[in-house]
Amino acid sequence: FPTRRSSDLISTDDNRTKNFGLINAGFGLGFIIGPIIGGTLGQFGTHTPFIVAAILSFINFIFGYYFFPESLKANNRRKFDRKRANPFGSLKHLQKFPLIKTLVLSMIFVSIANHSMESVWAFFTIEKFKWSTSLVGYSLAFIGILSIIVQLWLVSILAKKLGDKRMAVLGFVLMMTGFFLFAFTPWQWLLFPALLLFIVGGIQGTAVQSIMSSAMPDNEQGELQGALGSLMGLTTLIAPPLMTSSFSYFTGKQSEIYFPGIPFLIASILTLISLILFLKSFKKSNRLIKSVDK
């Protein structure tokens, strides 16, 4: 999150969204390469991957401390406030920004929806389409690789052509459609076009991040990213029980309706709610601007 904050401070309005996309792509690449390296090093002992991870973290610390320039100028820094040095204090303070408050809520709903993939994708494809574990693994690799391409290449193109707001709306619609197809498709070949819609729909997250960052003062970027990090962590506690329990119920004998796609229907509805909140946030912001102008 300090990385995201620094990225915003060194970005301009023209390249902010592109830079957020690069950071997201970097995280995605790490999630692909990391397990490969860890699995390879594990052959030399169970402690080896952790030792190498510690060395890489130390190298990263040295680079950040000695070579990465401070992005927040001294005259823009504010005094430390213990009341705001926690997620709830930060969120309370962020409420004074009308655009931010509703966007944060929008991000919570879509984050819960996104966790449906990691929670039940393997269970769903094996249950409904009898996929092998290898095919599940290939599909997850497909998601990871294509996500990197989208964040590295497509985000910057769409940001220039559509702008952040329209790009976010497009992302919400594509993701919602992808989830809906997962839920109801009777054909497994349709899963891959649906995956494509879901992955490209990830552009909404990058666009919303850029919008929120551009609406905040420089000396409060770190607080915004920290609060968002805490809330996104909270969604990882909510989503897995919600998605797995609904899947278990509607694929079990106790349910009169057999519907393994129920988690993705829930995800589609949550994404629709996120889209509505996103659009509502701009209406609120526009009304506030008009009232101030009067």
Predicted regions and their residues:
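Short amphipathic helix-loop junctions that connect adjacent transmembrane helices
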Residues: 119-136
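Short, small-residue-biased leader/transition segments that mark boundaries at the very start
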Residues: 1-6
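Helix-to-loop junctions at the C-terminal end of transmembrane segments
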Residues: 150-164
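Multi-pass alpha-helical transporter architecture, strongest
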Residues: 61-67, 265-294
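C-terminal transmembrane helical hairpin of 12-TM major facilitator-type secondary transporters
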Residues: 165-208
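Juxtamembrane intracellular "pre-TM" segments in multi-pass secondary transporters
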Residues: 69-105, 128, 294
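A membrane-interface helix-boundary motif in multi-pass transporters
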Residues: 42-55, 245-270
